[in-house]
Curated annotation (Swiss-Prot):
Protein name: Selenide, water dikinase 2
Residues with PTM N-acetylalanine: 2
Residues the record marks as site: Important for catalytic activity: 66
CDD domains linked: SelD (cd02195)
Name of the encoding gene: Sephs2
Length: 452
């Protein structure tokens, strides 16, 4: 009975918060660059057959390539440091015990012990440096193509790498490296045409983020792979550790879900067997628009949201990628110093993607387990700040393309996360109807690069 009453109270709380948030609709394109003149990629502009597909050079897509979460936890047990080894921490930083996240491992000094204990945690590492009260924050990510446009694939890959820094409220990146694998199945012509476009997309996104690509590694491999490393040295007040959520906080999401569904559905347009399973719930035009919406969202940096985390006193955050919103919420909940749990009530989803997920019997979108690529930030904000954050991020002064929704609350609990049985689905309408029809400059040499 007590549990039911608590659930009811949570529902009322969410209704009030959503009412305070105001408009739930999308608000345009990405900051720094406009996608309004984007023209859908056509392989013919590169001298390829109309049936040419970038995604044919890999067997998996985007962040869907991640090792399943439970399997990953077991594999990473091998990184646990033996008790006799010296600790990774360097003592106290700013009068507080420093939390170190090493390659997705959270390290905190164990109770009653001089040595840190290890647990699976977040994606960035935060390493206190020996001098000057500075910390090294570093992250790496790579994946396989999930869109057909090589230039946009490069942008998405870079945005995805930077997102781990942004999830910690870091807005500046000192350096990036690019990791690139060129498919050995490609012809020489394909390599010469496609590879420079992917590199240009990656570089342009890095420059939009105020950083530069200074090196990396390029190899030949059966599948195309693209990603990189992002590094920054910063003071403690420049980042927000993801461990300070408190009861009463509100969960805010800054990009809609459904990117992986949209990417797969777009490929199913050429696969009659799979298309027949979903054609009763979605039209070809709706799939094309959803795919374009997903692509633009994935290519949008989370940098503005990272800056606003400081303005509105965020307590913790993570980015939503390969483990879906539920998996990443659970990871974030495990990091919390306080005894709290996250409860998700609302799921902003690209229009029609929930219907496709149901009709296909795949993805688990409504269950929160569908992989996302270069997804939004899930941020724990003080309740009184959440609606203001959602309003502020849509301001034209940050450029176009940013949006946010209140999706859940932080309750007293045991560091877990869950989605309620019947979450409210917020259908996010694609913004690309006019963009798809707009005339774009000649892209025969630059593929479908967005305009500046």
């Amino acid at each position: 009975m007590a549990e039911a009453a608590a659930a009811g109270a949570s529902g009322e709380t969410m209704a009030a918060l959503v009412a305070a948030e105001g408009s739930l609709g999308p608000a345009g394109w990405s900051a720094g660059r406009s996608f309004s003149n984007y023209r859908p990629f056509e392989p013919q502009t590169l001298g390829f057959s109309p049936s040419w597909r970038l995604t044919s050079f890999s067997g998996m897509k985007g962040u869907g390539c991640k090792v399943p979460q439970e399997t990953l936890l077991k594999l990473l047990e091998g990184l646990t440091r033996p008790a006799l080894q010296p600790p990774l921490t360097s003592g106290l930083v700013g009068g507080q015990e420093e939390t170190v996240q090493e390659g997705g491992l959270s390290t905190r000094p164990g109770p009653g012990s001089a040595f840190p204990s290890l647990s699976i945690g977040m994606d960035s590492c935060v390493i206190p440096l020996r001098h000057g009260g500075l910390s090294l924050v570093q992250t790496t990510d790579f994946f396989y193509p999930l869109v057909e446009d090589p230039y946009m694939m490069g942008r998405i890959a870079c945005a995805n790498v930077l997102s781990d820094l942004y999830a910690m409220g870091i807005t500046e990146c000192d350096n990036m490296l690019m990791l690139l694998s060129v498919s050995q199945s490609m012809s020489e012509k394909e390599r010469e045409k496609v590879t420079p476009l992917m590199i240009k997309g990656f570089r342009d996104a890095a420059e939009e983020g105020g950083t530069a690509v200074t090196g990396g590694q390029t190899v030949v491999n059966p599948w195309i792979i693209i990603g990189g490393v992002a590094t920054v040295v910063c003071q403690q007040n420049e980042f927000i550790m993801p461990d300070s959520a408190v009861v009463g906080d509100v969960l805010v999401l800054t990009k809609p879900l459904g990117t992986q569904v949209a990417a797969n559905a777009h490929q199913w347009l050429d696969n009659p067997e799979k298309w027949n399973k979903i054609k009763m719930v979605v039209s070809r035009e709706e799939v094309e628009l959803a795919y374009q919406e997903a692509m633009f969202n994935m290519a949008t940096l989370n940098r503005t949201a990272a800056g606003l985390m400081h303005t509105f006193n965020a307590h913790a955050a993570t980015d939503i990628t390969g483990f879906g919103i539920l998996g990443h919420s659970q990871n974030l909940a495990k990091q919390q110093k306080n005894e709290v749990s996250f409860v998700i009530h609302n799921l902003p989803i690209i229009a029609k993607m929930a219907a496709i997920s149901k009709a296909s019997g795949r993805f688990g979108l409504l269950q929160g387990t569908s992989a996302e690529t270069s997804g939004g930030l899930l941020i724990c904000l003080p309740r009184e700040q959440a609606a203001r954050f959602c309003s502020e991020i849509k301001s034209s002064k940050y450029g176009e393309g940013h949006q946010a929704w209140i999706v859940g609350i932080v309750e007293k609990g045991n560091r877990t996360a869950r989605i309620i049985d019947k979450p409210r689905v917020i259908e996010v309408l694609p913004r690309g109807a006019s963009a798809a029809a707009a005339a774009a400059p000649d892209n025969s040499n630059a593929a479908s690069e967005p305009s500046s």
